[in-house]
C-alpha cells in the first residue's frame, strides 16, 4: 500500500465487536461505531452506515461470526439451526446487493463441516477474515486490470461510491485511480453527486481527496454537458448485482450515464468482483430493486426541500442493460463481448479451481 493512501478502512474485526466507519457522518465527521449485536449489524447495513456491495458482505460476515460466539449450546445441530436463523435475518437488511447473501452463505458453509461448536465458531471467524483479505487483493487486481484502459491526461466520470470505503481497500471503480497515482499516471475524475443520498458528493469526493486523487464534483444533471465540454474519455462505475447476461444493477443514475456515454460514443465500464455476479438469474428483470424512505428525496441532511405530502418514487438502484456496457472489469480480466458466454465460461473455470 502506498504511503500516501490515507483512506481509513470501512470495516474491521475486533474480538468483541465489528468496527465500522460511519459513512452517514462523512464528510463532516470521521466517526467509528462498534457493533456488538445482530440488531446493530442489521441497522448499520440497512441505514447505510456501511454501504457498498463488498463492504456490506464483509460486515455481514463479521456480524454472523460475532453473533455465533453468543450461541449457547454444545450441540452442533442446534448451533447450526440458530446460526441459519441469524443468517436469514441479516440477509434481509438490503435486497439488491448480492454480496450480502454470498458472504453469509459462504460463512454458513464453513461452519457446516465442523465437528464441534467451538470448531464452528473458530471457522466462522477465520472465514470472515479471509473474505476481507481476499477482497483487498481482488480490488487491487481489478484496478490493475483496468489501468491499461486509460492513459495519462484522461478525464473519467463515475457515480456513487465504488471506492475504498465501499470495500476492504482500493475499491472497484476507483481502484485504478489509486494505482495510477503510484505509477505517475495523471487521471482526472469527475464525480456525480448521486442524489438522493449524495454518495458521490459525501463519499467519493471525500475519499479521493483523502487519497490525493484529482477529483471534480458535479451534480447529476451536469453529466451530459460535462461529457461534451470536458472531453470525458470513459465512464467507470461499480455494481451491486450482475445477471448472467451482463445486465447490471448499480446506484440509481447509472443507467442514465450509460445512455449518455453511448450518445457521446464514450466507453462505459463496470468494475466488480466475481462475488457480485448472480449467475442464478438470467437478466436484469430478475434483480429486486430496493425502494427507500421517501424522506431521502424530500430532505437533504435533515432540511426539508419538498412538501412533506408529495408522493415520492425512490428506487435505490437501476438496471443498465448489457448492450450499453463496453466491458465488465473483474479480478480475472475484462469481459468485453458475448457477455453471457464469457460469464458462463468464467464461472465454469472458477468451479474447477
UniProtKB/Swiss-Prot annotation:
Q: What keywords does the record list, in alphabetical order? A: Amino-acid biosynthesis, Isomerase, Methionine biosynthesis
**Which class of enzymes does this protein belong to?**
isomerase
Residue numbers marked as site, Transition state stabilizer: 160
Its recorded reaction(s) are: 5-(methylsulfanyl)-alpha-D-ribose 1-phosphate = 5-(methylsulfanyl)-D-ribulose 1-phosphate
Q: Supply the EC number(s).
A: 5.3.1.23
Positions bound to substrate: 51-53, 94, 199, 250-251
Entry-linked Gene3D superfamilies: translation initiation factor eif-2b, domain 1, Translation initiation factor eif-2b, domain 2
Any single GO BP term: L-methionine salvage from methylthioadenosine
Q: Does the keyword Isomerase apply?
A: yes
Which pathway or pathways does this protein act in?
Answer: Amino-acid biosynthesis; L-methionine biosynthesis via salvage pathway; L-methionine from S-methyl-5-thio-alpha-D-ribose 1-phosphate: step 1/6
Q: Where is the active site?
A: 240
Q: Which GO terms describe its molecular function?
A: S-methyl-5-thioribose-1-phosphate isomerase activity
One Pfam family from the record? IF-2B
Q: What is the annotated signal peptide range for this record?
A: none
Q: Is this entry keyworded Isomerase?
A: yes
Check the record and name the PANTHER family matching this protein. METHYLTHIORIBOSE-1-PHOSPHATE ISOMERASE
Provide the function of this protein: Catalyzes the interconversion of methylthioribose-1-phosphate (MTR-1-P) into methylthioribulose-1-phosphate (MTRu-1-P).
Q: Which family does it belong to?
A: Belongs to the eIF-2B alpha/beta/delta subunits family. MtnA subfamily.
Describe the subunit structure.
Homodimer.
Q: What name appears for this protein in its UniProt entry?
A: Methylthioribose-1-phosphate isomerase
Amino acid at each position: 500500500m502506498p504511503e500516501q493512501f490515507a483512506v481509513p478502512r470501512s470495516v474491521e474485526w475486533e474480538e468483541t465487536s465489528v468496527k465500522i466507519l460511519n459513512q452517514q457522518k462523512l464528510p463532516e465527521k470521521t466517526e467509528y461505531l462498534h457493533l456488538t449485536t445482530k440488531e446493530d449489524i442489521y441497522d448499520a447495513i440497512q441505514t447505510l452506515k456501511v454501504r457498498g456491495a463488498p463492504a456490506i458482505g464483509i460486515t455481514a460476515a463479521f456480524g454472523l461470526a460475532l453473533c455465533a460466539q453468543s450461541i449457547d449450546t454444545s450441540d452442533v445441530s442446534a448451533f447450526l439451526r440458530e446460526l441459519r436463523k441469524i443468517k436469514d435475518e441479516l440477509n434481509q437488511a438490503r435486497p439488491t446487493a448480492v454480496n450480502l447473501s454470498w458472504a453469509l452463505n459462504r460463512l454458513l458453509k464453513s461452519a457446516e463441516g465442523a465437528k464441534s461448536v467451538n470448531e464452528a465458531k473458530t471457522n466462522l471467524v477465520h472465514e470472515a477474515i479471509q473474505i476481507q483479505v481476499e477482497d483487498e487483493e481482488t480490488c487491487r487486481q481489478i484496478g490493475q486490470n483496468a489501468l491499461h484502459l486509460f492513459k495519462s491526461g484522461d478525464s473519467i466520470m463515475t457515480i456513487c461510491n465504488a471506492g475504498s470505503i465501499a470495500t476492504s481497500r482500493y475499491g472497484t471503480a476507483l481502484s485504478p485511480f489509486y494505482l495510477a497515482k503510484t505509477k505517475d499516471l495523471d487521471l482526472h475524475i469527475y464525480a456525480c453527486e448521486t442524489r438522493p443520498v449524495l454518495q458521490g458528493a459525501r463519499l467519493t469526493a471525500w475519499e479521493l481527496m483523502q487519497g490525493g486523487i484529482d477529483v471534480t464534483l458535479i451534480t447529476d444533471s451536469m453529466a451530459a454537458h460535462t461529457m461534451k465540454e470536458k472531453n470525458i474519455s470513459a465512464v467507470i462505475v461499480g455494481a451491486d448485482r450482475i445477471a448472467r447476461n451482463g445486465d447490471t444493477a448499480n446506484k440509481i443514475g447509472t443507467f442514465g450515464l450509460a445512455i449518455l456515454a453511448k450518445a457521446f460514443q464514450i466507453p462505459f465500464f463496470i468494475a466488480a468482483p466475481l462475488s457480485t455476479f448472480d449467475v442464478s438469474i438470467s437478466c436484469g428483470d430478475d434483480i429486486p430493486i430496493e425502494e427507500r424512505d421517501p424522506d431521502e428525496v424530500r430532505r437533504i441532511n435533515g432540511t426539508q426541500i419538498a412538501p412533506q405530502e408529495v408522493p415520492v418514487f425512490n428506487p435505490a438502484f437501476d438496471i443498465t442493460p448489457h448492450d450499453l456496457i463496453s466491458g465488465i472489469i473483474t479480478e480475472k480480466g475484462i469481459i468485453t463481448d458475448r457477455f453471457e458466454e464469457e460469464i458462463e465460461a468464467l464461472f465454469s473455470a472458477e468451479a474447477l479451481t
